[in-house]
Regions:
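Aromatic-lined carbohydrate-recognition surfaces of secreted/lumenal glycan-active proteins
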Residues: 3, 11, 137-140, 144, ...
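The substrate-binding groove and active-site-proximal loops of carbohydrate-active enzymes
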Residues: 1, 13, 88-112, 128-138, ...
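Glycan-recognition surfaces
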Residues: 153-234, 238-240, 247, 251-254, ...
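Loop/turn elements at helix/coil->beta-strand transitions in domains of secreted/extracellular proteins
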Residues: 1-3, 126-131, 155-157, 216-217, ...
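Short catalytic/ligand-binding loop motif for oxyanion handling, primarily in non-cytosolic enzymes
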Residues: 10-18, 139-142, 167-171, 228-231, ...
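Loop/helix patches that line or flank the sugar-binding groove of alpha-linked glycan CAZymes
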Residues: 224, 229-369
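Active-site groove signature of glycoside hydrolases
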Residues: 8-11, 116-139, 220, 224
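Substrate-binding/active-site clefts of carbohydrate-active enzymes
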Residues: 1-122, 170
Length: 369
């Protein structure tokens, strides 16, 4: 299965296609740059203003120029984006006039909608199985309804949304027509806090309660490219500490589970990768090669002979967890009962550090503790 990353909210400031056919029009190529906003434009502009973001660099060493300045990807309507803004990106215009009360101009269909649909249909036509849609909540849900309907009418593509605002979950599933949403703000953040002893294990109960009715639509994970590795010094410091959390998210419900590459090897993400530096993550901004994964690839053998004993141990644990999650009927289609929720006043049960639940299918019952 192949799932690719689709970034619909923003593109690089120097974006252009180096492989398009002659009849394809690049994003922004026909924009009226004298207008701050136009439904026919692909970008937002700051007319009469030049982009300024030297960040201490000398003028003679800073060759990039942009006039008029385009609005930055994180909705920064300022010609002087800060270091914490997404200054290397420009915001795409889906027909919402942010500067004038967020009035929407969706009829006729904005030019950006058609261009982005062309991109989606191109990749769907290549036979991909799914799309992980970056910062989907920053794009109008009306676009998603329209675009996903068009794509899925032609191709069996799975759509996964990166949405961090829980109040938008239901509308992005129902109206937006997404198949799954990232469970980051709820389950991931809670499990990370439990591992780091920053919150009680009983907080996990609130996670499933918050998404009751659509729990099966939440994509659970403990690592991805944006987050710090479990084994990093910024998270738990060792891979074993993440095993109980993996068991919770893999066994608790029937929702999908995602493993980030190298997670099953205990990858720490503590390399110094150029621009990113040592941050506990793996290569957000830089091309990089990870030794733990290279050792598993082992010149195309894809075996464990190049792994350390500790890496093999972690990998085998992950294999067992995933095998149970895929084959046990009580996990794949069973009922769920939260035992921690039922034992809040039980003095023999430590709700601060323990979490327990039951799964049941026909006569099969599983206790997870």
């Amino acid at each position: 299965k192949v799932i690719i990353d689709f970034v619909p909210n923003h593109v690089s400031r120097q974006y252009h296609s180096d492989a398009k056919e002659s009849f394809i029009v690049d994003l922004g190529q026909t924009d009226n740059t004298s207008k701050a906003f136009s439904p026919g434009n692909n970008f937002y502009y700051l007319p009469g203003q030049t982009l300024q973001f030297h960040f201490g660099a000398k003028q003679e060493d800073f060759e990039y120029s942009e006039f008029p300045a385009k609005v930055t990807g994180n909705d920064c309507f300022n010609a002087n984006p800060g270091m914490n803004d997404w200054y290397e990106t420009i915001k795409l215009n889906y027909g919402v006039d942010y500067a004038n009360g967020k009035v929407s101009y969706f009829n006729p269909i904005p030019d950006t909608w058609n261009k982005m649909l062309e991109i989606l249909m191109f990749w769907a036509g290549k036979g991909i199985d799914g799309l992980r849609c970056d910062m989907a909540e920053m794009v109008p849900v009306e676009f998603w309804h329209w675009a996903i309907t068009h794509v899925t009418n032609c191709y069996p593509v799975c759509f996964i949304a990166e949405v961090y605002n829980p109040s938008l979950y239901r509308i992005f599933l129902s109206k937006g027509k997404f198949d799954y949403l990232y469970d980051k703000v709820g389950l991931y953040d809670t499990l990370k806090a439990v591992i780091r002893k920053e919150t009680s294990a009983c907080s996990i109960t609130k996670c499933w309660q918050a998404v009751e009715g659509f729990q099966d639509k939440m994509l659970a994970f403990m690592e991805n490219h944006d987050e710090q590795r479990i084994a990093s010094n910024f998270f738990a410091g060792n891979a074993r500490s993440g095993i109980p959390a993996m068991m919770v998210l893999a066994f608790m419900h029937v929702n999908p589970v995602m493993i980030y590459f190298g997670q099953e090897l205990g990858e720490s993400g503590m390399d110094e990768e150029g621009f990113s530096g040592v941050d506990g993550r793996t290569s957000i901004f830089d091309y990089w090669s990870i030794k733990s994964v290279r050792n598993w690839v082992n010149n195309g053998r894809f075996d464990e002979t190049g792994l350390t004993e500790k890496q093999c141990e972690i990998r085998n644990i992950y294999k067992k967890i995933l095998r149970i999650a895929r084959t046990e009927k009580a996990i794949t289609s069973g009922l769920f009962y939260d035992l921690s929720y039922a034992n809040t006043s039980n003095k023999c049960f430590n709700t601060g550090r323990q979490y327990a639940f039951m799964r049941k299918h026909d006569n099969e019952e599983l206790l997870d503790l």
